[in-house]
Each structure stands twice: as C-alpha cells, then as structure tokens.
C-alpha cells in the first residue's frame, strides 16, 4: 500500500508539472480580481508619495512596461517607432553568436537609423550614430552596441509621452495591478501542495502549485516549534533576509525566493522549483566528471556567486549537495541558510561544511568576506573531478583532521589535470587570501579570465546557451521516495509551546518579491485577466450609463482623494455599508450606490483620526464630537495607509485654520449633514459646499 501511495504521489506531481509548463493559466484554481478603476485616485497618491510614479520606476517593472508598450503601440502613433526600435535592440542583445549580431546589427542600422537620417527625421544625437557606425565599420558587434540609443530612446519617452501615459486608462490598469500586488497576503490555501521532495534540519520541501496563476514552485516549510527547540530563530530569519537580497535582478543560477509567509505553526519560503536532483546525487550515479563537463558547471556557479557577491552576500556553504539541476540540466545554488551580509560588518564565525571551508573561516576570530566562497569553489571543483574533497584523504570522517589539513596541507594536483586546470585550482586553493584568485580586487572577473575558461563566451553562459553535459531523465521525480525521505518525530516537539513572544519574532516575515510576482503574472494570467476585466468594465458601462458618476463628481473641485470604503457608523447597524467617499480640505462626503442624497462630515466636527482593529482587520476610527464615531474599512493595505494619511493631513490643516479663526471655533454644528436637496452630480461650486 505504501508503494502504491508513493507511485500515486509521483504521478500527481508529474502531471501537475506537465500541465503547468503547457498552460499554467488553465491550471489556476483561483482568479485574480482587479479592483474598480476608481482605485486610481488612491493608488496614484500612494505611489506618488513613494516616488513610484516616474518613467524609470514604471518602465523598469514588467507589468509597467507591458502596459506602457500597449499604450504606445496602440494609442500613440508618434511613440510607436521608438518602442519598436527599443524592442529590436533588446532582441539583438540576447543573440547567441557574433555572426547573428553582425547580420542583425546591420538590419537595425538600416531600418531605424539610416532610414531616419536620410529622411532628416532622426531624433537621436550625433554621438550615438557615430558610436554605432564606428563599431560597424570595424565589424565590432558587442551585445551593448546600441546602448547609447537605449538611453536616448528612454529620454525621448520620458517627457510628454510619459505624461500622456499617466493620463490614460493604461495607467489606471497599472494602478489596479499594483493594488493587487501590494495587498498580497498568502496562506496555505493559495497553494496546492504535492509530494515531499526533501527534508532539512527544521522542516521539509514540497512541490506546490500557486492557485491563482498555476505556476509550480518549491515550498520550504520550517516548523516553528523545531526552530525554537534548536534555538534556530536567527538562522531562519537570516535565510529570509539573504533570499530577499539575492532574489532581485536577473540571475538564473540561484534558487531564488518569490514569496515568504507564515502560519501559526510554519515558516514558508516559496522558491524556484528544481526537478533535476543535485550534483552530489549525480556524482554518485554518474561518477566523476571530465574537465569539459566540470567547466560547464563551474561557469554557471561562478555567475551565481558573482550575483551574490555584488550584493555583499557571502554564501559559505558551497558543495555539490547544494547545487541543484533543473529539468534541462542547468544548475542553481540553493539553501542560503548559512549565507551572510558583509556590507557593514565582515563575519568571523566558523560555519560551513568541513572539507569545503576556507582557512580564514576555520581560524577563530578572523574576519572574512567573499574570499571564502572562492576557496570553497576550488574544493568543490576538485570533488567533481576526483570524487572527494582535496582535504579529505582516505575517506576520513574526522572533522578535526580535515580542518587541520585545510590549514596546513599543500594540495597536490594529479598529473592528469591540464595546465589550465592546475592554474585555476592552484589560484582558488591559495591559503593566503591576498594571493587567492577572486580576491585580488576584481572578484569573479579574475576567475572568468582564467585560461581554463578561455573557450567560453560568458554572455552565452549567462543566457544558458551551452548544452548541459547531463540532462535529468524526463517523466521521473528526481528525488527520493517520500518514505525514504522520512518525517520528523512529532514527540521531539511535543513539549514545546509557542508563545506570543515567539510569534512576534516573525511579525515582519511575510514578503513578496515584486519583480518575481510581476514576471509570474506576465507569463501566466496577465493577458487573460486584462481581457476579462476589459469586458466586465465595458459591460458595466453599457448597463449603467452613470458608471464613472462617482469620479465625475470630483472633477473640477478641490477633491483630495476619492474611492470606495465600508463604514460602520450608525448605532443601530452592525453591518458594514459600502460607500463612495470624497475627501475635501474641509469635509468628508459619501454616498451609497444608486443614491442621490449624500452625507458629509466637516473637519471641525472630527476630534481624532486613529487606527483600530475589528476582528483582526485594521480599520480607521473617526471620533466625532458628541461621543459619536465612524469606523471605516478599506479593501486593501495601500488604501488604508493612504486614507489614514490624507484624512489626518486634512484634519490637521483644518484644525490649524480653525485656530487662526477663533470665532468659528465654538460655533455649534451638526456632526453629520445629509445633503438631500440637490443631486450629487448637479452640485458644482468651486469648493464643493
């Protein structure tokens, strides 16, 4: 029966993988719902306050760029050639060979530069043209050949063109998507969890599928009780911090994190799913690797380490077991539990795996930085070639002996190693940091320039264009059976109690990596959700000619912000009432759907604007003169933050105004006034009163 359960778990997992690759959106069991277009009023304020409504910020985001592109190509004829030119340059930069770049560079020059020069309509500088022409004459076609044009295209798009985008419906859609992104609160219900694929000191790793996009991930679950029992809180939180540092930017050689969240019992990391097993497993199955095969793995690992080091992260646990293969055979560095940020202070702790730790890591009290990883790289490459660490002779398991040899022994390299390989390993395995390859001031570049890698084009390595030496078998789960992986003994943590103080440690644990969420959405459901939302909004407009009525009321007035909130302010009502609110400098107005009369609350009558909680949801509490109060609830976190800020600012400014006009201060007023005489749309005075 156990065997049958294992087979069924494998089949279910493999089917989910295949369907996710083919049509991930079709696998989505939940649907992303975009908020009403009126969210723009609040979100634009929210983003502006954080410096996010700039050309650079929006253009550099995946969803921002896609909406930008749609607007320019379909609604702004004058910007269309610029966007097309930009995209052709991006395609050129990803070409694999120099031959391809020679042909494509000439085509781009003829179509987008020479054509405009002949028509005397070239909007770019003479320097940019001469830069490209000079290289083409010499038949030099580096990937960044057109970089001056990229900068000038962006400069051209940055002005009036960008302002037209901000005024368009496409920016409204951007605000809708940003609201969704900034209001992500993940739970286990957002994932379909499949079979276990690994186990560590604090928990397990499972294959899983994200419900709203259908994308497959690895879910690393750490048990909070086990963490407490082993006093591993610092390690768990450190891993989350290190993953957040390395998971931004384009790096296909690290197992990156897209999300982190927690439940009362577990900490969960949502990571890139790697289905090909690890190098330790393949070394045991395949036997030692040739120099050529090892070169492939070394090159991809070097780029992964370079990405970390550029972010001032030292990995500290490089070994074959931590190098995972994807289904195509390319590798990523995994498990950042021992990684450390050395940007402000260099570490000096002796951590890592014996046989791979650098001498400076083993020496007590000695500070180190990325130097430690280059020594570990030398040890790992030696193991891939010989089957054991250079400091683990005769299969000894004595850690003290391994450490002693690391600190004192000069590594003897076999005569079978090529001179280029010997040079590389001798450089990496230098005990003296000041003489070690990678530690002489130029980091990874020193290793890339080693004669051992002379045959490689590092751009092609980055683009993963070299064929892997080993491709994991398809249709198999390259992990041990669930029963072989085993499970933790629940008795171990039976006496461990999680207190409020324990949970408080993880208060800031949840995280969404913006660029990875946007990439996930773009690859899966972006077009589908946009099309469905367009249809829904068009249907509402056709059904109700008054759609947009709420927003129209704010036009031409001194309305600070407007949008939907739910209120609970009537002592006879215990249910939330959804209303559309308008904030003016001297009052707050609101009305219900299909209601002509509306109510208002003047700033003079408000005594305070506070944040409160009702059933674990944050709300706004407006205390009114006479002992009354209103409670307002927002649909998302950004809305709550912005309404609180704007209400407090308006209240504060109104108070200052009242202080300057003493006669108005004690004038009695009704706290809430119903404006029932004139329909909302007809009221058009300059100050709205």
UniProtKB/Swiss-Prot annotation:
Residues 1-190 are annotated as: N-terminal. GO terms for biological process: cardiac muscle contraction; cellular response to catecholamine stimulus; cellular response to chemokine; cellular response to epidermal growth factor stimulus; cellular response to glucose stimulus; cellular response to phorbol 13-acetate 12-myristate; cellular response to rapamycin; desensitization of G protein-coupled receptor signaling pathway. Specifically phosphorylates the agonist-occupied form of the beta-adrenergic and closely related receptors, probably inducing a desensitization of them. Key regulator of LPAR1 signaling. Competes with RALA for binding to LPAR1 thus affecting the signaling properties of the receptor. Desensitizes LPAR1 and LPAR2 in a phosphorylation-independent manner. Positively regulates ciliary smoothened (SMO)-dependent Hedgehog (Hh) signaling pathway by facilitating the trafficking of SMO into the cilium and the stimulation of SMO activity. Belongs to the protein kinase superfamily. AGC Ser/Thr protein kinase family. GPRK subfamily. It comes from Rattus norvegicus. GO terms for cellular component: apical plasma membrane; axon; basolateral plasma membrane; caveola; cytoplasm; cytoplasmic side of mitochondrial outer membrane; cytosol; dendritic shaft. The active site is at 317 (proton acceptor). Expressed at low levels in brain cortex, hippocampus, striatum, hypothalamus, cerebellum and brainstem (at protein level). ATP binds at residues 197-205, 220. Residues 454-521 form the AGC-kinase C-terminal domain. It catalyses: [beta-adrenergic receptor] + ATP = [beta-adrenergic receptor]-phosphate + ADP + H(+). Residues 191-453 form the Protein kinase domain. The record marks 3-4, 10 as: Required for receptor phosphorylation. Residues 54-175 form the RGS domain. It is found in: Cytoplasm; Cell membrane; Postsynapse; Presynapse. In contrast to other AGC family kinases, the catalytic activity is solely regulated by the binding of substrates and ligands, not by phosphorylation of the kinase domain. InterPro entries: AGC-kinase_C, GPCR_kinase, Kinase-like_dom_sf, PH-like_dom_sf, PH_domain, Prot_kinase_dom, Protein_kinase_ATP_BS, RGS. Pfam families: PH (PF00169), Pkinase (PF00069), RGS (PF00615). This is Beta-adrenergic receptor kinase 1. The PH domain binds anionic phospholipids and helps recruiting ADRBK1 from the cytoplasm to plasma membrane close to activated receptors. It mediates binding to G protein beta and gamma subunits, competing with G-alpha subunits and other G-betagamma effectors. Its EC number is 2.7.11.15. Interacts with the heterodimer formed by GNB1 and GNG2. Interacts with GIT1. Interacts with, and phosphorylates chemokine-stimulated CCR5. Interacts with ARRB1. Interacts with LPAR1 and LPAR2. Interacts with RALA in response to LPAR1 activation. ADRBK1 and RALA mutually inhibit each other's binding to LPAR1. Interacts with ADRB2. CDD domains: PH_GRK2_subgroup, RGS_GRK2_GRK3, STKc_GRK2. The modification Phosphoserine is found at residue 670. GO terms for molecular function: ATP binding; beta-adrenergic receptor kinase activity; delta-type opioid receptor binding; Edg-2 lysophosphatidic acid receptor binding; G protein-coupled receptor binding; G protein-coupled receptor kinase activity; kappa-type opioid receptor binding; protein kinase activity. Keywords: ATP-binding, Cell membrane, Cell projection, Cytoplasm, Kinase, Membrane, Nucleotide-binding, Phosphoprotein, Serine/threonine-protein kinase, Synapse, Transferase. Residues 558-652 form the PH domain.
């Amino acid at each position: 029966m156990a065997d049958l359960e294992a087979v069924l778990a494998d089949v279910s997992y493999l089917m989910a993988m295949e369907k996710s690759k083919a049509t991930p959106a079709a696998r989505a069991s939940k649907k992303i719902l975009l908020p009403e277009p009126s969210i723009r009023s609040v979100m634009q304020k929210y983003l502006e306050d954080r410096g996010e409504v700039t050309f650079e910020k929006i253009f550099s985001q995946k969803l921002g760029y896609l909406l930008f592109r749609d607007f320019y190509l379909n609604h702004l004829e004058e910007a269309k050639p610029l966007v097309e030119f930009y995209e052709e340059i991006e395609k050129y930069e990803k070409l694999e060979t120099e031959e391809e770049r020679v042909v494509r560079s000439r085509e781009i020059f003829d179509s987008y530069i020479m054509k405009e020069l002949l028509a005397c309509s070239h909007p770019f500088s003479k320097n940019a043209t001469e830069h490209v022409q000079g290289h083409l004459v010499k038949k030099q076609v580096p990937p960044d050949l057109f970089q001056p044009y990229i900068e000038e295209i962006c400069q051209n798009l940055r002005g009036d063109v960008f302002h037209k985008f901000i005024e368009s419906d496409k920016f409204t859609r951007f605000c809708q998507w940003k609201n969704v992104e900034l209001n992500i609160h993940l739970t286990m219900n957002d994932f379909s969890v499949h079979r276990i694929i690994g186990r560590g000191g604090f928990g397990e790793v499972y294959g899983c599928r994200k419900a709203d996009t259908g994308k497959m991930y690895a879910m690393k679950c750490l048990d909070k009780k086990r963490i407490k029992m082993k006093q591993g809180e610092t390690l768990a939180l450190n891993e989350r911090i290190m993953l957040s540092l390395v998971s931004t930017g384009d790096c296909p050689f690290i197992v990156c994190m897209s999300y982190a969240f927690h439940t009362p019992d577990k900490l969960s990391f949502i990571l890139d799913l790697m289905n090909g097993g690890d190098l330790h497993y393949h070394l045991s199955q395949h036997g030692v690797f040739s120099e050529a095969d090892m070169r492939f793995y070394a090159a991809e690992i070097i780029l992964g380490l370079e990405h970390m080091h550029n972010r001032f992260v030292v990995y500290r646990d490089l070994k074959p077991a931590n190098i995972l293969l994807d289904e195509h055979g390319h590798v990523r560095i995994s498990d950042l539990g021992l990684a450390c940020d050395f940007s402000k202070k260099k570490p000096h702790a002796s951590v890592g795996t014996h046989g791979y730790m650098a001498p400076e890591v083993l020496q007590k009290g000695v500070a180190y930085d990325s130097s430690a990883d280059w020594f570990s790289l030398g040890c790992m490459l030696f193991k891939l070639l010989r089957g054991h660490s250079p400091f683990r002779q005769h299969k000894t398991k004595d850690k003290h002996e391994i450490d002693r040899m690391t600190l004192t022994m000069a590594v003897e390299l076999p005569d079978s190693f090529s001179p280029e390989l010997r040079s590389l390993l001798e450089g990496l395995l230098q005990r003296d940091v000041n003489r070690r390859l990678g530690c002489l001031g130029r980091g990874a570049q020193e290793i890339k320039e080693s004669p051992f890698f002379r045959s490689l084009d590092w751009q092609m390595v980055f683009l993963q264009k070299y064929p892997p030496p080993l491709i994991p078998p398809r249709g198999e789960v390259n992990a041990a059976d669930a029963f072989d992986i085993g499970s933790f003994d629940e008795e171990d943590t039976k006496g461990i109690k999680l207190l409020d103080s324990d949970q408080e440690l993880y208060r800031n644990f949840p995280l969404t990596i913006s660029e990875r969420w946007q990439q996930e959405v773009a690859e899966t459901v972006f077009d589908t959700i946009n099309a469905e939302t367009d249809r829904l909004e068009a249907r509402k407009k056709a059904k109700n000619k008054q759609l947009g009525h709420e927003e129209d009321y704010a036009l031409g007035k001194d309305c600070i912000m407007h949008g939907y909130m739910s209120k609970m302010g009537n002592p006879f009502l215990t249910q939330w009432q959804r209303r559309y609110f308008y904030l003016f400098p001297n009052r707050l107005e609101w009305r219900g759907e299909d209601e002509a009369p509306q109510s208002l609350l003047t700033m003079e009558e408000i005594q305070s604007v506070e944040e409160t909680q009702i059933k674990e949801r944050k709300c706004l509490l407006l205390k009114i003169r006479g002992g009354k109060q209103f409670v307002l609830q927002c649909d998302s976190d950004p809305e709550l933050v912005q309404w609180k800020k704007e209400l407090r600012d308006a209240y504060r400014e109104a108070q200052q105004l009242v202080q300057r006009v003493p006669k108005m201060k004690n004038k009695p007023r009704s706290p809430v006034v119903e404006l029932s005489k004139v329909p909302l749309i007809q009221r058009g005075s300059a100050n709205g009163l």
